[in-house]
Protein backbone atom coordinates (compact mmCIF):
# COMPACT_ATOMS: atom_id res chain seq x y z
CA UNK A 1 0.00 0.00 0.00
CA UNK A 2 1.26 3.43 -0.89
CA UNK A 3 0.65 6.98 0.38
CA UNK A 4 -2.51 7.58 -1.67
CA UNK A 5 -3.81 4.01 -1.49
CA UNK A 6 -7.61 3.90 -1.32
CA UNK A 7 -7.37 1.02 1.19
CA UNK A 8 -5.34 0.80 4.40
CA UNK A 9 -2.67 -1.88 4.58
CA UNK A 10 0.95 -2.83 5.07
CA UNK A 11 3.62 -1.03 3.06
CA UNK A 12 5.49 -4.32 2.66
CA UNK A 13 3.46 -7.39 3.57
CA UNK A 14 5.79 -10.41 3.69
CA UNK A 15 3.88 -12.47 1.09
CA UNK A 16 3.63 -9.51 -1.27
CA UNK A 17 7.37 -8.85 -0.94
CA UNK A 18 8.24 -12.48 -1.66
CA UNK A 19 5.83 -12.72 -4.60
CA UNK A 20 7.30 -9.55 -6.12
CA UNK A 21 10.80 -10.82 -5.51
CA UNK A 22 10.11 -14.08 -7.34
CA UNK A 23 8.66 -12.13 -10.28
CA UNK A 24 11.69 -9.81 -10.47
CA UNK A 25 14.09 -12.77 -10.29
CA UNK A 26 12.60 -14.05 -13.55
CA UNK A 27 14.34 -11.12 -15.27
CA UNK A 28 17.10 -9.90 -12.93
CA UNK A 29 20.04 -12.09 -11.84
CA UNK A 30 20.00 -12.70 -8.08
CA UNK A 31 23.58 -11.46 -7.68
CA UNK A 32 22.45 -8.03 -8.97
CA UNK A 33 19.35 -7.70 -6.80
CA UNK A 34 19.06 -5.82 -3.51
CA UNK A 35 15.96 -6.38 -1.39
CA UNK A 36 14.28 -3.12 -0.35
CA UNK A 37 13.41 -2.96 3.36
CA UNK A 38 11.04 -0.35 4.81
CA UNK A 39 12.28 1.49 7.88
CA UNK A 40 8.96 3.31 8.12
CA UNK A 41 5.33 2.52 8.79
CA UNK A 42 2.13 4.22 7.70
CA UNK A 43 -0.48 5.27 10.20
CA UNK A 44 -3.77 4.91 8.34
CA UNK A 45 -6.80 7.02 9.22
CA UNK A 46 -10.27 5.90 8.13
CA UNK A 47 -13.21 8.28 8.49
CA UNK A 48 -16.79 7.88 7.36
CA UNK A 49 -17.75 11.00 5.42
CA UNK A 50 -21.10 11.26 3.63
CA UNK A 51 -21.51 7.49 3.82
CA UNK A 52 -18.10 6.78 2.28
CA UNK A 53 -14.88 5.71 3.99
CA UNK A 54 -12.13 8.28 3.42
CA UNK A 55 -8.63 6.83 3.81
CA UNK A 56 -5.49 8.86 4.43
CA UNK A 57 -2.07 8.00 5.80
CA UNK A 58 1.10 9.44 7.22
CA UNK A 59 4.55 7.85 7.03
CA UNK A 60 6.16 7.64 10.46
CA UNK A 61 9.38 6.33 11.97
CA UNK A 62 9.65 3.18 14.04
CA UNK A 63 10.22 5.39 17.09
CA UNK A 64 7.04 7.36 16.39
CA UNK A 65 5.06 4.11 16.18
CA UNK A 66 6.37 3.10 19.62
CA UNK A 67 5.31 6.51 20.94
CA UNK A 68 1.80 6.15 19.45
CA UNK A 69 1.42 2.66 20.90
CA UNK A 70 2.56 3.90 24.30
CA UNK A 71 0.10 6.82 24.25
CA UNK A 72 -2.96 5.15 22.67
CA UNK A 73 -2.45 1.68 24.22
CA UNK A 74 -4.22 -0.31 21.48
CA UNK A 75 -4.24 -4.08 21.44
CA UNK A 76 -1.27 -5.20 19.34
CA UNK A 77 -1.65 -8.56 17.61
CA UNK A 78 0.59 -10.61 15.34
CA UNK A 79 -0.78 -10.66 11.79
CA UNK A 80 0.46 -13.88 10.23
CA UNK A 81 -0.51 -12.83 6.70
CA UNK A 82 1.54 -9.64 6.73
CA UNK A 83 4.37 -10.94 8.91
CA UNK A 84 3.89 -7.89 11.11
CA UNK A 85 2.27 -6.74 14.31
CA UNK A 86 -0.98 -4.86 13.78
CA UNK A 87 -2.67 -2.26 15.96
CA UNK A 88 -5.93 -0.40 15.66
CA UNK A 89 -7.49 2.33 17.78
CA UNK A 90 -10.28 4.87 17.59
CA UNK A 91 -10.01 8.58 18.15
CA UNK A 92 -13.17 10.60 17.76
CA UNK A 93 -14.98 9.26 14.71
CA UNK A 94 -11.79 8.04 13.05
CA UNK A 95 -10.22 4.58 13.13
CA UNK A 96 -6.44 4.38 12.97
CA UNK A 97 -4.68 1.26 11.67
CA UNK A 98 -0.98 0.44 11.81
CA UNK A 99 0.92 -2.49 10.31
CA UNK A 100 4.12 -2.22 12.32
CA UNK A 101 7.60 -2.53 10.85
CA UNK A 102 9.95 -3.59 13.65
CA UNK A 103 12.81 -5.98 14.38
CA UNK A 104 10.59 -9.04 13.88
CA UNK A 105 9.12 -7.96 10.53
CA UNK A 106 12.52 -6.81 9.24
CA UNK A 107 14.02 -10.11 10.43
CA UNK A 108 11.48 -12.05 8.37
CA UNK A 109 11.86 -9.86 5.28
CA UNK A 110 15.66 -9.83 5.41
CA UNK A 111 15.65 -13.64 5.62
CA UNK A 112 14.55 -13.59 1.98
CA UNK A 113 18.06 -12.38 1.11
CA UNK A 114 19.38 -15.79 2.20
CA UNK A 115 16.44 -17.74 0.86
CA UNK A 116 16.97 -16.35 -2.66
CA UNK A 117 20.75 -15.78 -2.34
CA UNK A 118 20.43 -12.07 -3.19
CA UNK A 119 23.24 -9.52 -3.41
CA UNK A 120 22.06 -7.71 -0.27
CA UNK A 121 19.60 -5.13 0.99
CA UNK A 122 18.71 -1.47 0.66
CA UNK A 123 16.38 0.48 2.90
CA UNK A 124 14.12 3.48 3.00
CA UNK A 125 14.42 5.72 4.98
CA UNK A 126 17.60 6.09 7.03
CA UNK A 127 16.80 7.74 10.33
CA UNK A 128 13.35 6.15 10.56
CA UNK A 129 14.71 2.85 11.93
CA UNK A 130 15.01 1.88 15.58
CA UNK A 131 18.44 0.93 16.94
CA UNK A 132 17.59 -2.79 17.15
CA UNK A 133 17.10 -2.96 13.38
CA UNK A 134 20.86 -2.67 12.87
CA UNK A 135 21.43 -5.71 15.09
CA UNK A 136 18.93 -7.72 13.03
CA UNK A 137 20.58 -6.67 9.78
CA UNK A 138 24.05 -7.33 11.18
CA UNK A 139 22.97 -10.85 12.10
CA UNK A 140 21.17 -11.50 8.82
CA UNK A 141 23.52 -9.84 6.35
CA UNK A 142 27.01 -10.45 7.71
CA UNK A 143 26.60 -14.01 8.88
CA UNK A 144 27.23 -16.45 6.07
CA UNK A 145 24.53 -19.08 6.24
CA UNK A 146 21.91 -20.49 3.96
CA UNK A 147 18.18 -20.03 4.41
CA UNK A 148 17.68 -23.39 6.14
CA UNK A 149 20.37 -22.53 8.70
CA UNK A 150 18.79 -19.10 9.23
CA UNK A 151 15.31 -20.63 9.61
CA UNK A 152 16.55 -23.17 12.17
CA UNK A 153 18.34 -20.47 14.18
CA UNK A 154 15.32 -18.16 14.02
CA UNK A 155 12.48 -20.65 14.36
CA UNK A 156 10.81 -18.59 17.11
CA UNK A 157 10.92 -15.44 14.96
CA UNK A 158 9.57 -17.25 11.92
CA UNK A 159 6.54 -18.63 13.79
Q: What residue spans do the PLM features occupy?
A:
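Conserved, mostly hydrophobic/aromatic
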Residues: 35, 113, 121
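Hydrophobic, secondary-structure "cap" segments at the distal end of domains
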Residues: 58-116
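Solvent-exposed, polar/charged alpha-helical surfaces in well-ordered, non-transmembrane soluble domains
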Residues: 18-22, 107-111, 115, 135
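Substrate-binding surface in catalytic domains of secreted glycosidases
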Residues: 1-69
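Aromatic-rich peripheral "rim/lid" segments of glycoside hydrolase catalytic domains that contact
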Residues: 112, 127-159
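Soluble non-cytosolic domains of exported or imported proteins
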Residues: 11-18, 100-107, 128
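Aromatic/acidic polysaccharide-binding cleft in carbohydrate-active enzymes
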Residues: 36, 45-51, 124-137
